[in-house]
Amino acid sequence: MMMTAIGLMSGTSLDGVDVALIKTDGRHVAALGPSGYRPYTETERGLLRQALAEATGLDRRDARPGILAEAERAVTIAHAEAVAAFVAQNRITAGAIDIVGFHGQTVLHRPAAKLTVQIGDAQALAKAIRIPVMHDFRAADVAAGGQGAPFVPVYHRALAQSLGRDGPIVVVNIGGVSNVTYIDGNDALIACDTGPGNALLDDFVFRAIGKPFDCEGRLAAQGTADEGWIADALQHPFFAQRPPKSLDRNDFASLGLRDWSPADGAATLTAFTAGAIAAIVPLLPKPPTSFVITGGGARNLTMMRMLREQLEPARVESADALGWSADAMEAQAFGFLAARGLKGLPLSYPATTGVSFPMTGGLLARP
């Protein structure tokens, strides 16, 4: 049975709440609906930053000492307001929505200690919006020994299947770190980080010319990549490791950057990101026939050109070119995961989070 679901996502950047509507049965995506955004106020951001600092001392996932209780109330209200504004703007009645997927705000994620904490009161949210709310998606995976992330690959698979193409297909998300989802048409999924995404490049560009990023890859387009440095950097042991594998934004900070001109440095680090993505291909079960690029890197035209060169003969295209929304993808994913959780379908797999068997997850709060 097809359901109309709303997904809600509040990410680590603490910018605000993304909202997206999706029609799905938890296996297939029938339609992608509108999306919206409710920014956090400066006061709310400050409160969340304090909550992140205070959460480092937590040893129980249900504890809300001090500022955490206040932050949880603020997160819940912000999400309720986001849903109310979204349904009003799009002239949707609450009764037309079957389920809301509520990720909450992660304040602590320590999978080695089997502890992941997302704040947000799902019961209060369900009452406020008068729609059932699926929440607490990561807890079961972490309790079973998984990493509790990534959870979006199962949604990537549904999107890829909707293309009706022969595979394998790889969805590449180029954020601060780059990660991939490998989809071969079977039920198994492989997901992992591939290396630096925009983080090294953005940091270099900021130091070199004071801009936060290389807009459309214009600076890199004027430079020449340092191929010797790239070859050395790709000798880092991470690139030979088989998936699943993950890293942090700062794991490559120790690579010694040379005294490049701004354009040559941007060209080198853009090519390094592309080369790191290409380095995963020999570690996959079969060579992919197409790559779909999402995240900020998809808007970098030089990055896209370099990826096409590195990944040929496979097809390389941006998510937006396929009618997917790079900006709404995570919110859509949690609408999709809510439908899956309702049906007891797996949300995570051994080759995505490292959990020992496919795991469902999520708890249901009724209004």
UniProtKB/Swiss-Prot annotation:
| Entries under SUPFAM superfamilies matching the protein | Actin-like ATPase domain (SSF53067)
Keyword field: ATP-binding, Carbohydrate metabolism, Kinase, Nucleotide-binding, Transferase
Q: Which domain of life is it from?
A: Bacteria
EC class: transferase
Checking Gene3D superfamilies in the record gives: 3.30.420.40
Q: What InterPro entries does the database record attribute to this sequence?
A: Anhydro_N_Ac-Mur_kinase, ATPase_NBD
The pathway to which it is assigned is:
Amino-sugar metabolism; 1,6-anhydro-N-acetylmuramate degradation; Cell wall biogenesis; peptidoglycan recycling
Name the NCBIfam families on file: PRK09585.1-5
Member of which family? Belongs to the anhydro-N-acetylmuramic acid kinase family.
Q: Which HAMAP family match?
A: AnhMurNAc_kinase
Specify the protein name: Anhydro-N-acetylmuramic acid kinase
User: Which organism does this sequence originate in?
Assistant: Rhodopseudomonas palustris (strain HaA2)
